[in-house]
Amino acid sequence: MVQSSSRLAATFSAQHAPEPALPRPGQSLLDRIGNTPLLRFDQLTAHLPGVTLLGKAEWHNPGGSVKDRAAANIVAEGRLSGQLSPGKILLDATSGNTGIAYAMLGAAEGFPVTLCMPQNVSAERKKILSAYGANIIYTDPGDGSDGAIRMARELAAKHPDLYFYADQYSNQANWLAHYHGTANEIWQQTEGRITHFITMLGTSGTFMGTSRRLKELNPTIRCISLQPDSAFHGIEGAKHMATAIVPKIYDPKLADADIEVATEDAYAMCRRIGRDCGLLLGISAAAGVFASLKVAEQLELGKEIVIVTILCDSGEKYLSERFWTEK
């Protein structure tokens, strides 16, 4: 029997059709943001029966800090809204980690980045930003992060067509990254057993977003914010709210308590964790562990307590600081 030309063509096409494409191996940069591990600090809580102290190790993000989460969401929302359009420069004020995240994303996705930051940020942060090709405008170290904010606002107002002003201190995409990501990860990783959430305030996005979602999941979770104990401190990225420009996304009513941490206590905890736990933590991360221990020591012991703090970054960006070698 002679087959029609159309049937022959169909048979040939079926026999020689390309096989379905397999999923591509590997992951993109964005795929690696989030889902960071929880690390136990059993060495520090041996004298506290029933207490589990956990730190969310945010240096496992590709940019090395918790700020990858907010930066990626801010960039995504900027593109979606059309504000970060082709040819525009992303502009923001930063104490370092968010800037590193912006610079990393800009290099990967092809948009230029200009950052305003205090001159006295760690040497390691400056080198990382240069390696990513970001344009840096340094501000007076005495003005802290507020000086960088004022500079960024001035540039954005003067050149609105040139810049997409990301404004992490006011951008709702900042805290929403933690509402949808960080909080749900913590809930799942602790199997809903978390009793306390403790972290340092900077932009306040991590605390705001994570606390809002955790309170929805279990209103009895105690959410405790941390601040430096004075306007002049050495905890990079942290804000002393009473003397600083208060971020628009910050709502103090969300905290069940607020604890002040001295720079010296954070430094001492950096050293202790390095020598007793084998982890090099950033200064604000160590401040979180210090405060978490203080909270745990004041609780009624014997019942299960699960405290989670955010380890914002590792100590690698601070190794040029002198406190590591102090006794």
Where are these predicted regions, by residue range?
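PLP-dependent amino-acid enzyme catalytic core
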Residues: 1-327
